[in-house]
């Protein structure tokens, strides 16, 4: 695929293709279109038919998306139409071949017995998509989707604090570290990938929303290619490219300083606990029914059990006891139930390990692996060294009453 869409002008573009592939590509491109574009043409998707098939493009000067689709191009050309409208139409069409052709300043779309006539926008006013930087490395699509979803959950959503709305991407040769925080929780994931150069080093801040959309929508295929440039020029374009399986997108990097997160991660704990993730999530949801939105869920840890409780006399109280492997002095700590279940769901593990210091300091959640030493085998009441793992979720507690 060309790095930037080639324009051949609004002509009598005519093509035929399968509804499913058309709808998937249009939906993927339209997801990134602005709700309130600065100029009308930025709400459109550009359809370009050529010898290479059909290219569907979208761009708002911050994020670009482009998908290549197999199609029978009867007559080449380009046309610009409303992206959200075309996405709604293609998703609702019956599962039959789709025919599209330009008629003057309108586009005719047919599928089975359904017919649509859509207005067009001026192709000549549409901006040229940015060129992808040089490829920096690649990794399996499933690993990319999992890792991004694990850290994006902790990213902030307040645009007045741009340094917290991004995912920090650190590259050191074959190792990539992803980190995100909203000040109340911090998620860090480390993974291996195939770097274009073994001595490559870079650290950039990428909008979390864009990366999360790319992970959820799925580039698909066996590998995802990340493009930030190579050599000393890594990240200097201020652009990240993501490509694979006939799709490519770019996003501008954030020009902000991410917090120094490693110093926040504890090296030892005064108490540790392991328990079943599914049971804990269900218990949190159950007792939180009597809590106001965002109110705390308390956890009282003792040898062999943890009591979850929530609520107050005026709204009702709830509690549930669960079995836990615990080492350390008895501890009572409280969390925002939504943030806690977010972290538990991100572990991708049947069991969770908690590492505590005090009731007023962050708790460290990590997945339990088969190599973990049983809590019952730990000596005394700590301190217990923090265990190295490829994913951690650091969560601030909520102040206990009184």
UniProtKB/Swiss-Prot annotation:
GO terms for biological process: DNA strand elongation involved in DNA replication. Confers DNA tethering and processivity to DNA polymerases and other proteins. Acts as a clamp, forming a ring around DNA (a reaction catalyzed by the clamp-loading complex) which diffuses in an ATP-independent manner freely and bidirectionally along dsDNA. Initially characterized for its ability to contact the catalytic subunit of DNA polymerase III (Pol III), a complex, multichain enzyme responsible for most of the replicative synthesis in bacteria; Pol III exhibits 3'-5' exonuclease proofreading activity. This is Beta sliding clamp. It comes from Mycobacterium bovis (strain ATCC BAA-935 / AF2122/97). One of its GO terms (molecular function) is DNA-directed DNA polymerase activity. One of its GO terms (cellular component) is cytoplasm. Forms a ring-shaped head-to-tail homodimer around DNA which binds and tethers DNA polymerases and other proteins to the DNA. The DNA replisome complex has a single clamp-loading complex (3 tau and 1 each of delta, delta', psi and chi subunits) which binds 3 Pol III cores (1 core on the leading strand and 2 on the lagging strand) each with a beta sliding clamp dimer. Additional proteins in the replisome are other copies of gamma, psi and chi, Ssb, DNA helicase and RNA primase. Its main location: cytoplasm. Belongs to the beta sliding clamp family. InterPro entries: DNA_clamp_sf (IPR046938), DNA_polIII_beta (IPR001001), DNA_polIII_beta_C (IPR022635), DNA_polIII_beta_cen (IPR022637), DNA_polIII_beta_N (IPR022634). It is found in: Cytoplasm. SMART domains: POL3Bc. Keywords: Cytoplasm, DNA replication, DNA-binding, DNA-directed DNA polymerase, Nucleotidyltransferase, Transferase.
């Amino acid at each position: 695929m060309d790095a930037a869409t080639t324009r051949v002008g609004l002509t009598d573009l005519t093509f035929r293709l399968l509804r499913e592939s058309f709808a998937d590509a249009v939906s993927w491109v339209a997801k990134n279109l602005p709700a309130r574009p600065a100029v009308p043409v930025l709400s459109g998707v550009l359809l370009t038919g050529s010898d290479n098939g059909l290219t569907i493009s979208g761009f708002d000067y911050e994020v670009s998306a482009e998908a290549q689709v197999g199609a029978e191009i009867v007559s080449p050309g380009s046309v610009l139409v409303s992206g959200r409208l075309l996405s709604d139409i293609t998703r609702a069409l019956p599962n039959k071949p789709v025919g599209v052709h330009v008629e003057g300043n309108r586009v005719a779309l047919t599928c089975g017995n359904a017919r649509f006539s859509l207005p067009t926008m001026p192709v000549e006013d549409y901006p040229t998509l940015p060129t992808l930087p040089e490829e920096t490395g690649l990794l399996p699509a499933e690993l990319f989707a999992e890792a991004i979803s694990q850290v994006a959950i902790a990213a902030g959503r307040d645009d007045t604090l741009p340094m917290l709305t991004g995912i920090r991407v650190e590259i050191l040769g074959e190792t990539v570290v992803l980190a995100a925080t909203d000040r109340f929780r911090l998620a860090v994931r480390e993974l291996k990938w195939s770097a274009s150069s073994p001595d490559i080093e870079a650290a950039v801040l990428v909008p979390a929303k864009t990366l999360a959309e790319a992970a959820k929508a799925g580039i698909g295929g066996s590998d995802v290619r990340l493009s930030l440039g190579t050599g000393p020029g890594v990240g200097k374009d201020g652009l990240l490219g993501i490509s694979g399986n006939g799709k490519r997108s770019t996003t501008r990097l954030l020009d902000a300083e991410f917090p120094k997160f490693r110093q926040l991660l504890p090296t030892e704990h005064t108490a540790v606990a392991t328990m079943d993730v599914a049971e804990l999530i269900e218990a949190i949801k159950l007792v939180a029914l009597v809590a106001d939105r965002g109110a705390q869920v308390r956890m009282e840890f003792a040898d062999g059990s943890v009591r979850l409780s929530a609520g107050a006399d005026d709204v009702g109280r709830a509690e549930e006891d669960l079995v836990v492997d615990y080492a350390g002095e008895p501890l009572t700590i409280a969390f925002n139930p939504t943030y806690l279940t977010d972290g538990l769901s991100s572990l991708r593990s049947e069991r969770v390990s908690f590492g505590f210091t005090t009731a007023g300091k962050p708790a460290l959640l990590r997945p339990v692996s088969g190599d973990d030493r049983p809590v019952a085998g730990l000596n005394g009441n700590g301190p217990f060294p923090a265990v190295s793992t490829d994913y951690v979720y650091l969560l601030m507690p909520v102040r206990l009453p009184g």
